[in-house]
């Protein structure tokens, strides 16, 4: 793409050098620390005289496949709604997730599975790494179109560390239950990205306003991402829950919640839409809020009715957020939320955390029976009451918001370093800044500027 020679040279070197450095450093750390766990290592597995059918691979890998498809296909295509940013939406999703899953294997490994001087990995490590990558991609949605790939890799480098620490504090130190990640994934990823976007605020972004919308075919491709996410979300929430009734219940609650959020979204979209017409932005995003809102409580005894009610509420709140709150977020709070992650992940994530507080507080031995140990082991052991568990669930939400806000602020300062390449204000949401785009897709209105204006450089 045309531009100053120094800027083009910086772009040519910055991404390759950063990719090579990050991959090289990760490879060295893998060589030193990462080993197969006892369910993956040939010698250790067969030493135990186990049947191959008992290996956790056969129980967990189907869920991993679904989660993997959500991360790379669902999230990637959900963000292709921008008319001139499809290559970047899918391509940078691919890049970020590929790095994040490696880096998070190390970070989470040091925190959760570090024994005898090594990190031990298996299929559950893959699922956890994909969960972390999902949080990074949620944050990416808030700054979509306004950042370069080198900036995004540095964002992931920081966010993965903070994600791992926050998850460790909630799940291991506080004993919070969050099977589907309403707090650890959605709330953390959303508010990390929103604070990051606030720090990177661009007052002259109006110069790229004409590229910020969608066209017919870009919305259609984005709907592919929605359908992938919608279909596989029960697997996402249940991927790491206790096998048996717990996993079964988690998938069922998510299934009903998604269905109800879809109907709520269609209803509200037509109600608030111009001339009673549906808005594809609402359908693409708010219909998924049902999966987010039951992330914390889906393994609990939420009841099918509770799942339907939660999903419907999430769908309506998310739709209203896209219609009314997103413009306020930009005009009053100076948060330029490209994908509306506050509406799809932020608000439903907080609602999901609060729903978890309520359902945890109602937990009794009569309701759960012997299953109480797999959902609330500390209550089953008599180490805490249901009320104490509920209070710690609420405190976990506060801790998550704190980590996300501080981390997003630090990330914003890091990404504002002047030597990092980012698109100028006049060329945001434009693939040709970072990609070779086929010539037939150019027209006079979309052809890149020959000379970049100094006053629009980020």
Curated annotation (Swiss-Prot):
Location in or out of the cell: Cell membrane; Basolateral cell membrane
A biological process from GO: ammonium homeostasis
Membrane topology recorded in Swiss-Prot or TrEMBL: Multi-pass membrane protein
Region called Interaction with ANK3, residue ranges: 416-424
Keyword check for Oxidoreductase: no
Catalytic reactions of this protein: NH4(+)(in) = NH4(+)(out); methylamine(out) = methylamine(in); CO2(out) = CO2(in)
Short motif Basolateral sorting signal, span: 429-432
GO cellular component labels: basolateral plasma membrane; plasma membrane; spectrin-associated cytoskeleton
Subunit structure: Interacts (via C-terminus) with ANK2 and ANK3; required for targeting to the basolateral membrane.
Family per similarity comment: Belongs to the ammonium transporter (TC 2.A.49) family. Rh subfamily.
Task performed by this protein: Ammonium transporter involved in the maintenance of acid-base homeostasis. Transports ammonium and its related derivative methylammonium across the basolateral plasma membrane of epithelial cells likely contributing to renal transepithelial ammonia transport and ammonia metabolism. May transport either NH4(+) or NH3 ammonia species predominantly mediating an electrogenic NH4(+) transport. May act as a CO2 channel providing for renal acid secretion.
Protein's recorded name: Ammonium transporter Rh type B
Organism: Macaca mulatta (Rhesus macaque)
Gene (UniProt): RHBG
């Amino acid at each position: 793409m045309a531009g100053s020679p120094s800027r083009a040279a910086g772009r040519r070197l910055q991404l390759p050098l950063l990719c090579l450095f990050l991959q090289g450093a990760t490879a060295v750390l893998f060589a030193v620390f990462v080993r197969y766990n006892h369910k993956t290592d040939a010698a250790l597995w067969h030493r135990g005289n186990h049947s191959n059918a008992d290996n956790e691979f056969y129980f967990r890998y189907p869920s991993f496949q679904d989660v993997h498809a959500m991360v790379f296909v669902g999230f990637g295509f959900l963000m292709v709604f921008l008319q001139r940013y499809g290559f970047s939406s899918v391509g940078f999703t691919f890049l970020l997730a590929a790095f994040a899953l490696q880096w998070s294997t190390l970070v989470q490994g040091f925190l959760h599975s570090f024994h005898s001087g090594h990190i031990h990995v298996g299929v559950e490590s893959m699922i956890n790494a994909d969960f972390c990558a999902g949080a990074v991609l949620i944050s990416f949605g808030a700054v979509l179109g306004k950042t370069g790939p080198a900036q995004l890799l540095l964002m992931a480098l920081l966010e993965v560390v903070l994600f791992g620490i926050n998850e460790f504090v909630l799940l291991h130190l506080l004993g919070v239950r969050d099977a589907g990640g309403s707090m650890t994934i959605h709330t953390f990823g959303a508010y990390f990205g929103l604070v990051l976007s606030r720090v990177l605020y661009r007052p002259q972004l109006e110069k790229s306003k004409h590229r910020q919308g969608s066209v017919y075919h870009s919305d259609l491709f984005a709907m592919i991402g929605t359908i992938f996410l919608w279909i596989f979300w029960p697997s996402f929430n249940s991927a790491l829950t206790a096998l048996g009734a717990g996993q079964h219940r988690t998938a069922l609650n998510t299934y009903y919640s998604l269905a109800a959020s879809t109907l709520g979204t269609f209803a509200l979209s037509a109600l608030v839409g111009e001339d009673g017409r549906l808005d594809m932005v609402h359908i693409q995003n708010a219909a998924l809020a049902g999966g987010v809102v039951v992330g914390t409580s889906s393994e609990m005894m939420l009841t099918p009715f509770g799942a339907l009610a939660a999903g419907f509420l999430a769908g309506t709140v998310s739709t209203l957020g896209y219609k009314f709150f997103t413009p306020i977020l930009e005009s009053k709070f100076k948060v330029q939320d490209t994908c509306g992650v506050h509406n799809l992940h932020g608000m439903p994530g907080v609602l999901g955390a609060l729903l978890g507080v309520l359902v945890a507080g109602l937990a009794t031995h009569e309701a759960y029976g012997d299953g109480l140990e797999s959902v609330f082991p500390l209550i089953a052991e008599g180490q805490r009451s249901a009320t104490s568990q509920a209070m710690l669930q609420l405190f976990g939400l506060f801790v998550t918001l704190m980590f996300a806000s501080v981390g997003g602020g630090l990330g914003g300062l890091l990404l504002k370093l002047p030597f990092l390449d980012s698109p100028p204000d006049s060329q945001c949401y434009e693939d040709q800044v970072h990609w070779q785009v086929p010539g037939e897709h150019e027209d006079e209105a979309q052809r890149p500027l020959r000379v970049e204006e100094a006053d629009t450089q980020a």
